[in-house]
Amino acid sequence: MKTQRQAKILELVRERTIETQEELAAALRAEGFEVTQATVSRDIKELSLIKIPGENNTSYYASPGEPMIRRGGEDRLRRLVRLSLSDINSSENLIIIKTPPGEAQGMASAIDHVHWPQIIGTVAGDDTILVIVKPKEATPEVVQRFLELARG
């Protein structure tokens, strides 16, 4: 039962934003597990779950090594795009993003870490990022995602 419960905990923190032990216990109960807060606390410790800062002074549980790729990475990219995207243009399967001087490499790194399936890579200079998209038909969708991030 413990192994199944802990597997479910890992699944829950991968798929949802769980901020408290109480939320995790409620989610487990909804999945049919009988748990107490003390049991959840022990499981969190045994699974080495960590708390990751979210937006608006919140934090959520995640497994070590996984969080920045998911929500934390998307939050970081959103902040960088909102603050630094000066211009965006595309042609075929290439997107050019302009940033203020010195900010392109940080944003390119954030783009790489969110692992959007349509983006196969980035190349960054001082103030310009080349984003390579596959298939080329996905380019307008990727541009739109960047514009949505820029709007907040």
UniProtKB/Swiss-Prot annotation:
Where, per UniProt, does this protein localize? Answer: Cytoplasm
Q: Which organism is it from?
A: Desulforamulus reducens (strain ATCC BAA-1160 / DSM 100696 / MI-1)
**Encoded by which gene?**
argR
Assigned GO CC terms: cytoplasm
One GO biological process this protein is involved in is: protein complex oligomerization
Q: Name one GO molecular function term.
A: arginine binding
Summarize the protein's role. Answer: Regulates arginine biosynthesis genes.
Keyword annotations for this protein, in alphabetical order, are: Amino-acid biosynthesis, Arginine biosynthesis, Cytoplasm, DNA-binding, Repressor, Transcription, Transcription regulation
Q: Which Pfam families match?
A: Arg_repressor, Arg_repressor_C
Q: What is this protein called?
A: Arginine repressor
Q: In which pathway does it act?
A: Amino-acid biosynthesis; L-arginine biosynthesis [regulation]
Q: Which family does it belong to?
A: Belongs to the ArgR family.
